[in-house]
């Protein structure tokens, strides 16, 4: 396998046995693709903005003489780029311009002649744009729109599982769910009548819906029942016989024909009887006249002479009616065929409870149910019913809904519209009745074929459509008002409702979330999150266990491991590593196609619906070199996702990868297969909380997923095109692009500006560090600079730490850990946190607030860190209470005391009419000011500091652009020089000339002269573009800022805090093994091995067996082996051994077992490359053990041997304090440890006095409110148990809510009088008031 220049720097040894058929797809596809579909023009108008416009336009006036037509739209370029929007606190968005056409028709003309057409472009608000990394910048903060898993539109058949009725009878129901519009439900009641509900309102007999569709009783019966025909022949009654219908019934008379008795009376009719009847072709039997009694007529029987109805349709036949029918001359009678077994009389029974008799009365009934209290008219009731299900404007099943509907009811694919038809409704009722009759079964709602993903684009489109519909109403009103001569489309459209709808969605929707930016993994997982909550989804309280459970259709689509603990468990999921959504929004996962027992390289994506009919083998099935299954029986998933053993020739597909089942976070856990699922869940979740350390350290034991996550997260800088590094410093990298990758006529220079020390959403530090050197050859897609938590383009969330599993004097009781002081000294877990504090100067009623260094009653020392504008210097070290920005607020006129008047008279007008409202550092925070930004409103004079910052920004912008220009010019002039020299010019002569003169030379060769002229033009273009860019930049910087109403100035101060690790901080491994640091121990007291090397962290071995996360032990062993090999390489480098020895040792390590997917051949490496590789392997050979396909025990032992270590993985340790040997060998190795964002500094908090709650007068709770500690019920019991009455009394009175008592107490303490007078706690008064509010008088009797 060929390695690029930077990949050769450090190669991870892969233990995977199976070749990688499919690389992990780009991880942010779900977000980017969805939004692209929303924004890009779709010529078919099926999706995105185009679909929204086409669904609302044209808007026709009520009189029909004018209409507003939609032509097309365009998005403008955003004013500021992403970075500028973040700094300014604005939204990264593009203006939407829509071309509309107002057409008015001639009222006089009969043939709709066009009278006038006006066309112009209308501004319709702003659409937030997605950044390259799948996020949105809204008001300066990065947000993510989480995809939603909701119930797919279509028809669903379900049952109440016997929970509704006390008898336990199972009631079936059907529900038609459109994409938008009214829901239609059908349900059985305990009496087996069929009812319908519209939008979950009051239920009506289902036949009312059929009558409203225009069906008569007779037609309704014809739709749902088979018939039995009776013939009256003299005094005999003959029945047409369909033998199959008799199965299971008991004969109430002898069934005989042609003198042969087939079934005797009272006998149950069996299959044998039916066979005999069918064999003899018996089509009619004589039945006693009692047999027809109680049967139901299928149509109206009318006495033709008198016109009297003898027996109505759905009426029962009695002896009397039978006689009347015979008398009226009817010889055949049709009745409905029903039985108790599988042909129930449900519709017939329902017609009996149906109060309506024709279409109008049915429509009235529906109108009364939908609009109670309004009198129905024929027109209004008809219009209401038609609008419910048969109007494309109000009702849409959508393509997905229609597809699901047709599949459920076995209609041909692709037929039917977005609205319902009569056939659709009847088919649903028929299927529901069939299910009640025992044919067919109900759907599984949690099946992923019944739930679909709704992503950003689709949700944004829905919001946009809501805004458009609001606009449509207003436009219709305007159009009908008349006087259209003076009106243009511009006047008709008010963009406010549209921008409000869009803004509300992006700003405050439940699914628009503040991006989790702790580290690259948390960003990627947040964007791949799938939530069942949100608008149109479930709610936490209502969701039961079934919805939250892992379903077998989740396989390869949703991760069974990664989900939050707590109330949202199972409702928020994560996309599996290879999953994607299809056009309908259903999740699909890739499989390798199997043909006749041979696995091909062909890959197909299948959704759950498609997958149902196939047998699919697992990814770890054994294959021979011809890709055929070696086992006689293969474990595979068959019907309904149940696994079983199948013959190789029966198998249709095979999984693509062993990591296919889990999400990216779970795929980062090595030896996941040896961890208990609950702990793996914690491990996957805690990796997202790891804080980026000062120096990222790649994991020694990884899974091979580290690289794709780091690259796809967008935190690292990746080369867009290949080339050579021409310039590199801490803040920018310049690449001279390879000739073959440049476009003709461009300079071929790529400039990458790096992000330096910026604050993330979680206050961690984002910083990019170059990892290439001058002159390095670079390929497209290679890493140029590492971001937070990345190391040479690999995800590096924590540090490799030498750990020992042993108890140590109780310091690792209950999951706590003992940490060596060396870890602190080496800054292994030191992190940088950046806080943003802002100070806002507003225009108040009493006058404007002012930012100034002249603050009343503040000493010189407090102002020492401020400049003359009253803003802190960059680089100042500040602590809690220090002033960062001086600000004064005008206060109202106050009555002056005579003394003040005197002082005023002597010293003149003192600035006493302002109060100090400066921005101070919050208590308990300290740090260094790393940046200050000043935003000034348009029209307000800028202060000195703002001008300095502006000047600095201009200088930097100019420097950036000048450098860019110089580099581009250098590239261009190099080409000019080559051209001139190739045409015979003298190089020495050329170099004496000014470069711009080169362009004025003439060349005899015409083609070369043309090239030179082209280059001269390009030079001119470059200069012009430089001037233009500089001017644009200058305008942006000088321009006043767009601040909120009433705000004059905003100053933002950024503080950086360096936090070392300390007792109380939370740490964790990757296997859910979390704990708190109990003590930082001196190095000399830590246990050490025979070489005198101390361990860095001591973990409790009791945390392993009960939690069943054995993966951590295997990781520790493999980590030890990897480090051992690193030590051997280090020793060889120190002894300066020849390269060949190094090469063969490293080759041996790579060739050792495993490596199914990757063979490393060091013979193709130059000596220099081998040495560079060895230098990077000094700290240990990084290994990858992919999930479910990792290293096994034998391989770990071999690797330990190669590293010259005991194969048990256990080492004799000595006590650092006494030097004595511990009783038995201890498991020592290297584990990857993370520092989580739960730092004791953020949690520690103390209060003496502070704010109190308004009603109860008790101290508030929580650090944010500077609250007290709650002395709760159980604590009270504890003091009661000790009999500490006085302590308890002060807890419940003066230390809590006895207002007078605590004031007196304070006075007493001040005056040195240690005395307490408790009174009545305020909460007693509150409870008395509450009881009185119930109308019960309650008083406290003073004794």
From Swiss-Prot:
Organism domain of life: Bacteria
GO (cellular component) term, any one: DNA-directed RNA polymerase complex
DNA damage in keyword set: no
Known partners and oligomeric status: The RNAP catalytic core consists of 2 alpha, 1 beta, 1 beta' and 1 omega subunit. When a sigma factor is associated with the core the holoenzyme is formed, which can initiate transcription.
One Pfam family hit: RNA_pol_Rpb2_3
Protein's name in the database: DNA-directed RNA polymerase subunit beta
Family: Belongs to the RNA polymerase beta chain family.
Record GO biological process: DNA-templated transcription
Gene3D superfamilies: 2.40.50.100, 2.40.50.150, 3.90.1100.10, DNA-directed RNA polymerase, beta subunit, external 1 domain (2.30.150.10), DNA-directed RNA polymerase, subunit 2, domain 6 (2.40.270.10), RNA polymerase alpha subunit dimerisation domain (3.90.1800.10), RNA polymerase Rpb2, domain 2 (3.90.1110.10)
Keywords from the named record: DNA-directed RNA polymerase, Nucleotidyltransferase, Transcription, Transferase
Annotated gene: rpoB
Enzyme class: transferase
């Amino acid at each position: 396998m060929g390695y690029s220049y930077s990949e050769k720097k450090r190669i991870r040894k892969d233990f995977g046995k199976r070749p990688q058929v499919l690389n992990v797809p780009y991880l942010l596809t779900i977000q980017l693709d969805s939004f692209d579909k929303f924004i890009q023009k779709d010529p078919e108008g099926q999706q995105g903005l185009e679909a929204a416009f086409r669904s609302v336009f044209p808007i026709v006036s009520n009189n029909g003489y004018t209409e507003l037509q939609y032509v097309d739209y365009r998005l403008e370029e955003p004013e500021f780029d992403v970075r500028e929007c973040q700094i300014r606190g604005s939204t990264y968005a593009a203006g939407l311009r829509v071309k509309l056409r107002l057409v008015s028709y001639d009222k006089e003309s009969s043939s709709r002649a066009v009278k006038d057409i006006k066309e112009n472009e209308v501004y319709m608000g702003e659409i937030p744009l997605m950044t390259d990394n799948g996020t949105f910048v809204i008001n300066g903060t990065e947000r993510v729109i989480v995809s939603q898993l909701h119930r797919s539109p279509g028809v669903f058949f379900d049952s109440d599982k016997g929970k509704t009725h006390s008898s336990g009878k199972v009631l079936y129901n059907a529900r038609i769910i459109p994409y938008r519009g009214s829901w239609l439900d059908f349900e059985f009641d305990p009496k087996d009548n069929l009812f319908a509900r519209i939008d979950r309102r009051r239920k009506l007999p289902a036949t009312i819906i059929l009558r409203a569709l225009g069906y008569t009783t007779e037609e309704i019966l014809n739709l749902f029942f088979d018939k039995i025909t009776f013939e009256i022949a003299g005094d005999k009654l003959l029945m047409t016989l369909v033998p199959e219908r008799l199965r299971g019934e008991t004969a109430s008379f002898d069934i005989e024909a042609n003198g042969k008795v087939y079934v005797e009376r009272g006998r149950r009719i069996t299959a044998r009887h039916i066979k005999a009847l069918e064999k003899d072709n018996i089509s009619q039997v004589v039945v006693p006249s009692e047999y027809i009694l109680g049967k139901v007529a299928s149509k109206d029987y009318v006495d033709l002479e008198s016109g009297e109805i003898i027996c109505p349709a759905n009426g029962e036949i009695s002896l009397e009616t039978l006689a009347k029918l015979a008398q009226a001359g009817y010889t055949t009678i049709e009745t409905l065929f029903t039985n108790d077994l599988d042909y129930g009389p449900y519709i017939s029974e329902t017609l009996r409870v149906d109060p309506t008799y024709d279409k109008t009365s049915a429509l009235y009934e529906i109108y009364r149910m939908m609009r109670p209290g309004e009198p129905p008219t024929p027109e209004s009731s008809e219009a209401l019913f038609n609008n419910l299900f048969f109007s494309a404007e109000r009702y849409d099943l959508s393509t997905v809904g229609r597809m699901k509907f047709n599949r459920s009811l076995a209609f041909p694919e692709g037929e039917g519209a977005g609205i319902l038809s009569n056939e659709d409704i009847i088919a649903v009722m028929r299927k529901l009745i069939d299910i009640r009759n025992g044919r067919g079964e109900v759907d599984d709602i949690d099946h992923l074929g019944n739930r679909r993903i709704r992503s950003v684009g689709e949700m944004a489109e829905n919001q946009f459509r809501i805004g458009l519909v609001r606009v449509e109403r207003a436009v219709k009103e305007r159009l009908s008002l008349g006087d259209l001569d003076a009106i243009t489309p511009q006047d008709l459209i008010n963009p406010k409702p549209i921008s409000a709808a869009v803004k509300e969605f992006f700003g405050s929707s439940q699914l628009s979330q503040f991006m989790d930016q702790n580290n690259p993994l948390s960003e990627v997982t947040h964007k791949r999150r799938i939530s069942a909550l949100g608008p149109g989804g479930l709610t936490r309280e209502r969701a039961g266990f079934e919805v939250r459970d892992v379903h077998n259709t989740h396989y390869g689509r949703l991760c069974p491991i990664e989900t939050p603990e707590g109330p949202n468990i199972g409702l928020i999921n994560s996309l599996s590593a290879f999953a994607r959504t299809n056009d309908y929004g259903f999740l699909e996962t890739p499989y390798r196609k199997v043909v006749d027992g041979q696995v091909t390289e062909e890959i197909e994506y299948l959704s759950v619906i498609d997958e149902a009919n196939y047998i699919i083998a697992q990814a770890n099935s054994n294959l021979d070199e011809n890709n055929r299954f070696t086992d006689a029986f293969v474990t595979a998933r068959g019907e309904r996702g149940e696994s079983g053993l199948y013959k190789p020739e029966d198998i249709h597909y095979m999984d693509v990868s062993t990591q296919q089942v889990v999400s990216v976070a779970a795929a980062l856990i090595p030896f996941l297969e040896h961890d208990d699922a609950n702990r793996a869940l914690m491990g996957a979740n805690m990796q997202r909380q790891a804080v980026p350390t000062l120096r990222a350290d790649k994991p020694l034991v990884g899974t091979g997923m580290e690289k794709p996550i780091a690259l796809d997260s967008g935190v690292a800088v990746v080369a867009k095109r290949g080339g050579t590094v021409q310039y590199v410093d801490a803040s920018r990298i310049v690449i001279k692009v390879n000739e073959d990758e440049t476009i003709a006529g461009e300079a071929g220079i790529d400039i990458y500006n790096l992000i330096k020390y910026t604050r993330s959403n979680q206050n961690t530090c984002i910083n990019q560090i170059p990892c290439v050197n001058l002159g390095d050859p670079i390929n497209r897609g290679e890493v140029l600079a590492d971001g937070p938590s990345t190391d040479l383009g690999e995800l590096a969330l924590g540090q490799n730490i030498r750990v020992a599993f042993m108890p140590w004097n109780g310091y690792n009781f209950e999951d706590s850990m003992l940490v060596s002081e060396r870890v602190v000294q080496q800054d292994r877990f030191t992190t940088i946190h950046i806080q943003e504090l802002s100070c806002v100067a507003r225009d108040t009623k009493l006058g404007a607030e002012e930012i100034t260094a002249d603050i009343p009653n503040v000493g010189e020392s407090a102002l020492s860190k401020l400049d003359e504008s009253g803003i802190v210097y960059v680089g100042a070290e500040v602590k809690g209470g220090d002033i960062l920005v001086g600000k004064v607020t005008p206060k109202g006129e106050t009555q002056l005391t005579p003394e003040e008047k005197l002082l005023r008279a002597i010293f003149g007008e003192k600035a006493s009419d302002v109060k100090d409202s400066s921005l101070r550092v919050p208590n308990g925070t300290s740090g260094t000011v790393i940046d200050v930004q000043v935003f000034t409103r348009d029209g307000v004079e800028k202060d000195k500091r703002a001008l300095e910052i502006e000047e600095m920004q201009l200088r930097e912008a100019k420097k950036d652009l000048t450098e860019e220009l110089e580099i581009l010019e250098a590239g261009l002039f190099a080409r000019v020089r080559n051209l001139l020299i190739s045409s015979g010019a003298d190089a020495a002569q050329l170099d004496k000339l000014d470069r711009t003169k080169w362009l004025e030379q003439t060349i005899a060769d015409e083609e070369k002269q043309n090239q030179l002229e082209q280059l001269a033009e390009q030079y001119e273009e470059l200069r012009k573009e430089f001037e233009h860019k500089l001017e644009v930049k200058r305008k942006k910087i000088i321009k006043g800022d767009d601040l909120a109403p009433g705000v004059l100035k905003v100053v933002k101060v950024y503080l950086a805090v360096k936090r070392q690790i300390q007792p109380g901080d939370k740490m964790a491994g990757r296997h859910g093994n979390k704990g708190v640091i109990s003590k930082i121990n001196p190095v000399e007291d830590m246990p050490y091995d025979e070489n005198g090397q101390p361990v860095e962290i001591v973990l409790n071995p009791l945390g392993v067996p009960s939690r069943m996360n054995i993966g951590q032990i295997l990781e520790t062993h493999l980590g030890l082996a990897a480090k051992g090999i690193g030590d051997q390489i280090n020793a060889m480098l120190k002894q300066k051994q020849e390269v060949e020895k190094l090469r063969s040792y490293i080759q041996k390590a790579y060739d050792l077992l495993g490596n199914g997917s990757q063979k490393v051949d060091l013979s193709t490496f130059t000596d220099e490359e081998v040495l560079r590789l060895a230098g990077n392997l000094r700290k240990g050979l990084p290994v990858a053990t992919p999930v479910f396909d990792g290293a096994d025990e034998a391989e770990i032992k071999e690797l330990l041997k190669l590293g010259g270590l005991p194969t048990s993985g256990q080492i004799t340790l000595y006590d650092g304090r006494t030097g004595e040997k511990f009783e038995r060998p201890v498991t020592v190795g290297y584990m990857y440890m993370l520092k989580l964002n739960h730092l004791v500094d953020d949690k520690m908090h103390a209060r003496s006095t502070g704010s109190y709650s308004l009603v109860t007068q008790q101290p508030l709770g929580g650090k944010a409110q500077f609250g007290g500690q709650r002395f709760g019920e159980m604590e009270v019991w504890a003091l009661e148990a000790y009999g500490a009455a006085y302590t308890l009394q002060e807890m419940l009175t003066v230390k809590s809510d006895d207002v007078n008592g605590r004031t007196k107490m304070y006075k007493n303490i001040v005056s040195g009088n240690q005395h307490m007078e408790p009174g009545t706690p305020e909460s007693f008064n509150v409870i008395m008031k509450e009881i009185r509010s119930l109308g019960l008088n309650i008083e406290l009797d003073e004794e």
